[in-house]
Amino acid sequence: QLGGFYALNTIGTVLGGVAAPFFLIPLIGTAMSVMVAVGLQLAVALLLLLQGWAGATPRFRFGTLGAIALAAVLVPTQLDVYHQALTTISVKRYPHLSVERAYVEGPDSTVVLYETDGTPQAKADANRFRIQVNASPEVAFDTYETKLMAHLPLLAVPDPKRALVICFGMGNTFRSALTHGIDVDVADINGAIPGLAKIHQPDPSRTFGDPKGRIVINDGRNFLLLAPHRYDMITIDPAPPVWTVGLGNIQSKEFYQLMSDRLTDEGVAEAWMVAGIKGDFEATLAAFRAVFPHVLVFWGAKYHAFHVLGSRAPIRFSKARLAQVLSQPRVMEDLGEAGVKSLSETLLEKLYVTDERGVDSLLKGVEPLTDDRPILEYRVSRGLEIKWFTFPKDVYSKLELVP
């Protein structure tokens, strides 16, 4: 009998582990799924209770009936408590982003799309939309920064044919890469996020209607591991905050090695690295540098972050390639959405910081971030103070464009 009960418990655990994330939560939500589970347990308890009802004392009977009645009254009032809690956290953090446009509960996270409330402060905010995952403000609608994540590395590839974007976000990098007329894959672990683009993007057909674009719901690292072909450009934008558990898996030396393995001989990798935590940034940059023999670093257009480009071959920006790209109407239209008139030589020189020589002088003695040393995920133990990182002036150099 004990073995039979143990077998039933194991079967129930397995079935519950499959049913909850893939059926119950997507169909009826987290709160209702909990209620269903509790209801099943109560039903079993009542069956057992009825078997001994005849021999129960009056106090026990009235107490049981009272508890059932109380639960019947209170349970319906708590069906939306999880949703309400997430909304409360979000509104406190960003008061002007209080209009909820979408709420999706998935197998591994809850995703909410917010929009500004129309106040003067909100209208002045460039980030009109914001996606929060489990109440964490991970994705903002910032076109300038995210468009550079596609255009900047593609400018450094002589004749690109195929690109990969890891992390869909608001879809801006994916859309921008498609304007180059190449095949573009995008991989995101969260199946709810790409669908939200149909709400927040001004022209969703550019994202979902381009035959050269392909959206894959999969972990970016696993996708790289199993990718059937090589790419001329791979760009990765880890969703902030960078110390989120598991995010080190797409910022480690081993991950960057996978990126390198899936690049063509002259392919370029691009990683957007936030420089808000001194020590964490250097470890991530060291992991990138340990893989790529050639590295270029550019300032982020708006944030305290860097666009880091890496390749197995020397990275060169040519005037001919720049002119070729800027002659494409779709590219110019895409840049115009972010208020950028042109990716001129002057702009590239302004954003440029240094190459691998400057990086090497900075990283002396710095241990790279690796899978078995995920130091990004232990920020609390190292203190919560944010120490902004910046490159020393003596590592800055001038960007030389070839003809």
Where are these regions (language model features)?
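Active-site-proximal structural scaffolding
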Residues: 1-4, 12, 16, 35-39, ...
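Membrane-embedded alpha-helical segments of integral membrane proteins
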Residues: 1-51
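Composition- and surface-driven signal marking solvent-exposed, interaction-prone regions
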Residues: 2-3, 19-21, 30-39, 134, ...
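Generic beta-strand/beta-sheet core signal
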Residues: 5-9, 26, 36, 114-116, ...
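Short, well-ordered loop/turn and helix-capping segments at boundaries between secondary-structure elements
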Residues: 17-20, 25, 45-52, 155, ...
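Soluble small-group transferase modules, centered on the S-adenosyl donor enzyme superfamily
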Residues: 56-157, 162-164, 203, 219-226, ...
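The AdoMet/dcAdoMet-binding core of the Class I SAM-like
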Residues: 125-126, 136, 140-285, 289-292
